[in-house]
Amino acid sequence: MNYLAAMLIASISGIRGTVGGQAGEGLSPSDVVQFASGYGAWILQKHHAPDRKPIVVVGRDARISGPWVRDIVCGTLNAQGIDVVDLGLSTTPTVELAVPGLNADGGLILTASHNPKQWNALKLLNDRGEFLSKDAGERVLALAKSTLTFADVDDTGTTTHDDSWLQKHVDHVLDLELVDPDAIRSAGLKVAVDAVNSSGGLAVPLLLKALNVEVVPVHCDPTGHFAHNPEPLPKHLVDLTDAVTAESCDLGISVDPDVDRLCFVSEDGSFFGEEYTLVAVADHVLAHTPGPTVSNLSSTRALREVSARHGCTYTAAAVGEVNVVAQMREVGAILGGEGNGGVIYPTSHAGRDALVGIGLFLTLLVSKGMTCSALRATYPDFSMVKDKMDLPPVDVDKALGVLQAEVKDAEVNDVDGVKFDLEHGWVHLRKSNTEPIIRIYAEGPSPEEAQALVDRFKGDLERHLASLEGPQA
């Protein structure tokens, strides 16, 4: 990962930054041109169809900066001789489906996911509609720093607009074998939806109305003026909780701005828990199609236990969707994802998809004939605490190694940072892929025990970091 500046971060998964300021210090128009052209050069190197220009699918969430970022991205790619299909307001999984659906060479998603409205980003997809591998991402970064040649005037590309893909995405979900539209339609559900005033305000109600669900909209106007911090955490979802109880809803649904994260609020206003979105979907999928499951190292133990209930194996992967997908392919997983509410169902496609998650979850809920809170009570109950600290200018990996050597009461996994599995819980410490921070996640039988693990290991890491000097490796 290359930190170009405090608020401009380039990594193998894309570039993100805050809008405004000088070039190289935030996400400026010149930075967008530089990175989009690096990606375009990579697309051109891979393209071998002499009868047509390369095609890239572009979609965006509703961020205020989205229109000008889109215009620059599309214009830059056109100037390189690449045709663009612009989906307009869209979702990350919608673009992922559209890339192979249009036989395109790649895709660009303009979204900073759960980051606040001042952030935006370019996320990069290959011709399968999946995030780039480490090698491909590094190649794009290298090309972005090089001197690039653009197309002659007669060879420039064009941009066409296609706003049909949200409906195609909904139709795709309804056609999945393990989604039962008729059962959901017959249940007469009432659901509150908080889409943080982004593109989920279009996509989620479109799916729910196709399932005969009465929708109570909460922040569903896709203006990009986020009504609260867009990360779907309990402290940010007070309006959704209030709507669920005030309107006597069967449940509430929250998605992040680009609709790849999904969490639920139960009918009594309690939080189902974003960690348990994947757990519940796994319960449904494994009951019908048993097979291996995968989640990342920072996800709840409950998935492992629910997998075991169905006689299935569980494997942990490094954090990051591309790592989870790679591990899923290695073990032949039937389902995977991340504990932040990201469901990856490869029967659909190899990417986190909140719409797919909604279809599978509602099918499970109506098939059980339970309330949302009663369903939650059927799963192992763990508590998670998520903390972080600023990334210091020292060798963090060395400090983690010292910490690893001194801990004797845990099983250790150092594939991605260091995870300590203890008898009654775990703690995972790692450098973030997207922000200049160290993430510290812990899980235990109770909130107090999880917090105690965070306090213990965070304190030990701070002690080791303070003893180090010199530049970060």
Which residues make up each language-model segment?
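An N-terminal, well-structured beta->alpha segment
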Residues: 2-75, 79-80, 159-191
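Gly/Ser/Thr-enriched, mixed-charge loops and adjacent short helices
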Residues: 18, 120-247
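N-terminal small/polar loop signature for handling phosphorylated ligands or for N-terminal nucleophile
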Residues: 41, 45-49, 54-119, 206-265
